[in-house]
Amino acid sequence: MVPVLLLLPALAGLFGAAEGQAFHLGKCPHPPVQENFDVNKYLGKWYEIEKIPVSFEKGSCIQANYSLKENGNVEVINKELRADGTVNQIEGEATPENITEPAKLAVKFFWFMPSAPYWVLATDYENYALVYSCTTIIWLFHMDHVWILGRNPYLPPETVTYLKDILTSNNIEVEKMTITDQVNCPESM
């Protein structure tokens, strides 16, 4: 018990340092994912509309492009426009996490890092997608990541509300979500 008590102040400091990120007591929730998910319909370019802020995304004009690799996995290319006008890009690979639930993927960007969950909670493939990721930290806390994506840089407010309602109905907080700036983005991205 004493080691846990010593660990709590350190974790509190860590959580305070991760401004905007969503840390919560307890293990990750397990919301239902998109039924009959078809990865082939999901491929292509998506624009980030809103998200729970994450330390690894600081820019604007954030977008993701998904394509099928020869091995059957999904190539992930994420891009953002930095404040200095340069484009930051990262490439990763998504693999099925559970063959019976194809909307549950695991994405990995660096060989030395563990994979992270990438769960598609909802999509109509042509307009919107709702993506959820959660990591449990030493059985005491969990950290949420949420992305609302669109095939176009903007979604109607009623669509965003619909997607946020899915989150809140599954006890996933949306209060920290922020709108991603998609104004004056270079076409070359």
Swiss-Prot record:
- Which InterPro entries has this protein been placed in? ApoD_vertbrte, ApolipopD, Calycin, Lipocalin_ApoD, Lipocalin_CS, Lipocln_cytosolic_FA-bd_dom
Q: Which domain of life is it from?
A: Eukaryota
Pyrrolidone carboxylic acid PTM positions: 21
Methyltransferase: is it a keyword of this entry?
no
Subcellular location per UniProt equals: Secreted
GO CC terms, sorted = cytoplasm; cytosolic ribosome; dendrite; extracellular space; neuronal cell body; perinuclear region of cytoplasm
ATP-binding as UniProt keyword: no
Query: What does the sequence similarity comment in the record state about its family?
Result: Belongs to the calycin superfamily. Lipocalin family.
How it assembles, according to the record, is: Homodimer.
Function statement: APOD occurs in the macromolecular complex with lecithin-transport and binding of bilin. Appears to be able to transport a variety of ligands in a number of different contexts.
Q: What is this protein called?
A: Apolipoprotein D
Q: Taxonomic lineage per UniProt?
A: Eukaryota, Metazoa, Chordata, Craniata, Vertebrata
Quick one: which gene encodes this? APOD
